[in-house]
């Protein structure tokens, strides 16, 4: 790809969603403008998923690429125009049966995603077993939740080198090998089934949670009498409660036939969020979303949110950083060898801290330097000096002394307080 094409591609990526309002900051944000490398809005610092950006086609491309070259190619279709794999998510439209019987206008409910099962009643049951605020009904809180989780759990930059910032040829190759490996060893999509279906699909003797085994025939069959197969009593692998016979359960092929989950229990073991569209990663007996599976395999840069494939990176404040991305969160100046202050888990250089975040001294009304000692009471602060932390009436120094706070003022005694009231 020549330089002009690269620049054009980069420009298109930064134009997507430009100006979209932030659903979190409301009018405080001037509109979405993608930071050059941080994956956040330059105006409000929120992620793209927090903005009212229409991402359905982009998300379908992302998931389609995830399923490319896997056993889940039945879930994708390639566009004739450019050959890009697109996710064929199952959209379900349900008709309100009560309204239909009463001969009135029929109400319909559209789910932006539903499990791809032939039995629509089973899909309906599955949806009803999810928390209402997480059911992906079009235009609802649940649809917004699904959109956020698609962005959070399956970042495009965890699978596509072209979505990353300035990878070297060696890093691109390492990332491609990493993606190929997790597709073949960890990636899976859950299946919605009734527990009784598992007895006909699993091995003749299956391990139950806890290690017990169940046989497939009753004792009477040993005497030549016909008998119904004995049904396995399944428990949810997550909550350990029993599975009800007629309720849908989720089966994860990579986990094995002996494990089932309640729909609301099919969650990432790290973030405890519902696994979006039942897309999971299996590792060491645990379910993960894509993000947290990758985090368990590779360090992630706290600056750009990308996985680190370079041997050289830095660690600070219990986080990992590309060398070029350990920067001030406000001005993007590199912080190597500089004084910085952590603000909401983000490093900020000293000048930006004083300008944007420092508390103001109630005594001198100047910003308090991060390296200077201070006295704080409730929401008020003072320089811990003989010039600032003084009685608001008689100017007695209060360092190491008892004091009486009153609405941003401090007094050395009841008498001084009365004189100022």
From Swiss-Prot:
Cross-referenced InterPro entries: LIM1_Testin (IPR034958), LIM2_Testin (IPR034959), LIM3_Testin (IPR034960), PET_domain (IPR010442), PET_testin (IPR033724), Pk/Esn/Tes (IPR047120), Znf_LIM (IPR001781)
Biased composition (Basic and acidic residues): 155-164
SMART domains: LIM
GO molecular function, one term: zinc ion binding
Principal subcellular localization: cytoplasm
Location in the cell: Cytoplasm; Cell junction, Focal adhesion
This protein's record includes keyword Transcription regulation: no
Span of domain PET: 92-199
GO cellular component: cytoplasm; focal adhesion
Source superkingdom: Eukaryota
Keywords from the UniProt entry: Cell junction, Cytoplasm, LIM domain, Metal-binding, Repeat, Zinc
Name of one Pfam family that matches: LIM
Residue ranges of domain LIM zinc-binding in the record: 234-297, 299-359, 362-421
Function in brief: Scaffold protein that may play a role in cell adhesion, cell spreading and in the reorganization of the actin cytoskeleton. Plays a role in the regulation of cell proliferation. May act as a tumor suppressor.
Family: Belongs to the prickle / espinas / testin family.
Subunit composition and interactions: Interacts via LIM domain 1 with ZYX. Interacts (via LIM domain 3) with ENAH and VASP. Interacts with ALKBH4, talin, actin, alpha-actinin, GRIP1 and PXN. Interacts (via LIM domain 2) with ACTL7A (via N-terminus). Heterodimer with ACTL7A; the heterodimer interacts with ENAH to form a heterotrimer.
Name the UniProt record assigns to this protein: Testin
Organism: Neofelis nebulosa
Gene: TES
